[in-house]
Amino acid sequence: AADVSFNNAKLDEAAFKVHRIRLEVLGGFHEKFSYHFRQSLNQYTTPNIPLDNLSGSVELAMVGWQLNDKWKLTAGKQPVQFSGYECWVNAIKVRHYSDFNNTIPCYQAGLNAAYKMNDNHEFNFQVTNNRNGDSADQFMYGLPEGVEPTKIPLLATVNWDGYFVGHAMQLRYSLSYGQLAKHKNVFYFTCGNVWDKKPFLGYIDFMYSREGVDSKGLISEVTAVNGEGTTVPNVDYFTTIFNLDYRVASHWNMYVKGVYEQGNVFKSNDMFSSGTYRRVWNVQLCAEYYPLKNSELLCYLHLLYKNIHLTEKARSWGAESYNHQRISLGLVYTLPVF
């Protein structure tokens, strides 16, 4: 893509960028088994030995076993069963992620059991790691003083997928719970509500996390303005996403997208008082042109306006509010290799 970026309406950078390139292999064997491998060439591994012993660039390395018509087991590095359309949809369809989805541990090694109740209802029961590297990689500024690393860095997730109105209405809801550090846990509630019936595709996502220590680093980064940063304890994040796609014609698609996000400290301590520290909203407009029928080749023009508002509590650390704009003219293509 050709990207032109601005900060506070002043030119920041104009450059060509390859936002996403991936190698993907998938297939099956012996009728009941499947495999899926995917490596991103835009991701960089952590300097320390990863928890799962895999390069951070490997997003998927999993094998599925269809036990019967109802049950399927999946083992290996796989998507965490978070919900929300933006989180779950193929990443090549997303031009700009919310801060929430850009910082969650979405691909982890673990085990998933899927139960298909019928054609309209499916449940997933999953246990995975909650991080790829060690704790030093997970927390941007290290653990707070007196907090010890966890010996059980796992995340348990329960998910429900429901389909209604001839599969036009798609609901996906998940609950997740795990341990970030000793006596410091994390809880996620994520949900996606989708309407997909041509020529419209619309969705509303709600994402919430409550964290004993700030694993996303979005609040903690305000402390690093005047020196070394500090990982903030007892934070929560809330994000809501609205998107509406309209297929104008067989070769044209347009969408508008809006995101609102909030980051809070829910319990005061010696350094941080409780309350809201950041509010973020962004608006996106995109036009997509498909020059070929039945092809994933598309050209797009994407406009982004993002406002990061830091409250007085955050500004007391020296951080400042700002806004960001970006214009992108790009190309997306899935190249099949047999």
What residue spans do the PLM features occupy?
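Loop-centered beta-sheet repeat module
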Residues: 126, 130-187
